[in-house]
Every structure is written in C-alpha cells, then in structure tokens.
Amino acid sequence: NFLNLERVTLSAPFLKTHLNKEREFNLSRLVKKSESENAQKADAKQTASKNEKPVEAAKQQKKEGEFDFAIKNILVENGDVDFSDASLFMPFATKITKLEGVLMDIDSTHPTMGTFEGVVGKSGFSKIGLKLLPYDPKKSTEVKFSFKDIDLVDVTPYSGQFLGYKIEKGKLNLTLNYDVKDSKLNGSNVVNLDTLTLGEKV
C-alpha cells in the first residue's frame, strides 16, 4: 500500500503548542499507538511462537499491515501559532502570526525537514526549524524556535513587569532548542534582553 502526493497546502492553519513544567509537549498526546497496531503486533508474536521460522513470520506480518506514504511538499500559508513554554526559568508565551513555510519530502521511510517564518507583535520576527520522523515523532524530533526583536509588551509573562518593576520598553531575543530521542526531551535556550527600561516599582 502506497500513497504519493505532490503538494498539500494548508491555508490559515492554527496550532497551539505548549510545553508544561514537566517538559511534556501537549502535541505528544496526539501520538499514540492505535489498537489495530497493537493487535497486529500481538498477532505477529503469536504467529512467530508457533512457527518454525519466527523471524520470517514476523517480517511477513509487518509487510502485510504496513502503509507507506510520500508527500513532496506541505505548504503553510498565513498560519497562526500560540506557543508557550512553562519549563523556562521565566515562563514564556506568545503568538506567532502570518506564518509561512514548507515541510519538504514527507516520507514514511526517512526524516522530514521544514522551515517556517512568522511575525510576533508589531515588529518581532520568528523562525522555526523542524526535523522529524513523520511516522514516529517520539523516536526522533528536533525543533528550533528563534525569536528576534520581540517587544516585551507582546509576550507574557514578561509584559507588564519585571523583578517587581513596570516595564516601559525593551526587546527580547530568544532561541529555544528541543530534541526528542526515544520519547526523552532535551532542551537548551539562550535569552537576551536588550534596551530594557524599567519604570516605577509595583
């Protein structure tokens, strides 16, 4: 069984992604083994145990149930992303708008890569780099978020106050790296506050 598509276009999609304090992505809950997949594996084990050639039997069972696919490009036009990370030392949340980009060579047999760019607030810029196994994202996924020239009034909880003082103005540059290997998440980040001006104490 094989499905091959040249192009898929997503117009004005919306995505809400959140990393909680336990460093778990909300999107990971959407990826789970289906009952049919579990049943196939159970049947394969049972067949193998009764067969004189268990390896060949398991391979045959997998071959009969697998489904391969390929999509040349997935285009994203005018998308919105609500992004938040509660695991940072100062939790970060913002909205990315006018997201444009492409996910290339989506295939069930090898990693897929994509790049996306969007706007944050009035003048901020965001870039997202993505590499994952589309058929098994928990096994291997790499995501990099880059935020540049973000006005602090356009993000929370930085907006409003900082260390007990009102923020009059300031810019935020932030890089967030997430690397998932075999369901284990490792992350790193770089935070830079530029031209931060504090007002009265609150």
Residue spans for each PLM region:
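Flexible, active-site-adjacent loop/turn segments at secondary-structure boundaries
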Residues: 25-28, 150, 165
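Secondary-structure transition motifs
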Residues: 1-98, 182, 193-202
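An active-site-proximal beta-strand-loop segment
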Residues: 122
